[in-house]
């Protein structure tokens, strides 16, 4: 909570991070990181706050891969408030890069990972 009794803006970013980690587990990103040292790294973040959130409330965070490039990707987020009847309280875009942590540089997204992401996206619609 901040001084105005709202959920602080940084909390929204943590919620998105948690949702992103669940997404990455679902498409095999975490296994790739453990086995090959290749994984996602955050390059940028844009958040639009549409309404304040106060305690108590329950949030629903929707996460989707909105773009897959050669070595980069974008993820979209919608955060909805139960107390506000499911209304959107924030939307966001995360800009990420697939990174080879051993080599210290971006690396192309493998066909296997791309297929898993597309499969996950198809199952969510």
What are these regions (language model features)?
Residues 1-44, 100-125:
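Hot-dog-fold acyl-thioester-processing enzymes
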Residues 53-55, 66-125:
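HotDog/MaoC-like acyl-thioester-processing domains
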Residues 23-74, 87-91, 97:
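Hydrophobic beta-strand-centered segment that forms part of the acyl-chain substrate-binding groove
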């Amino acid at each position: 909570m901040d001084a105005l009794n709202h959920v602080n803006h940084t909390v929204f970013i943590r919620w998105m991070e948690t949702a992103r980690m669940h997404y990455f587990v679902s498409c095999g990103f975490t296994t790739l990181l453990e086995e090959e040292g290749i994984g996602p790294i955050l390059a940028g973040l844009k958040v639009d706050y549409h309404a304040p959130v106060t305690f108590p409330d329950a949030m629903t965070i929707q996460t989707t891969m909105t773009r897959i490039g050669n070595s980069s990707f974008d993820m979209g987020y919608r955060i909805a408030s139960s107390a506000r009847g499911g209304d959107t309280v924030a939307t966001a875009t995360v800009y990420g890069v697939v990174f080879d942590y051993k080599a210290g540089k971006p690396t192309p997204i493998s066909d296997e990972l791309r297929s898993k992401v597309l499969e996950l996206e198809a199952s969510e619609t």
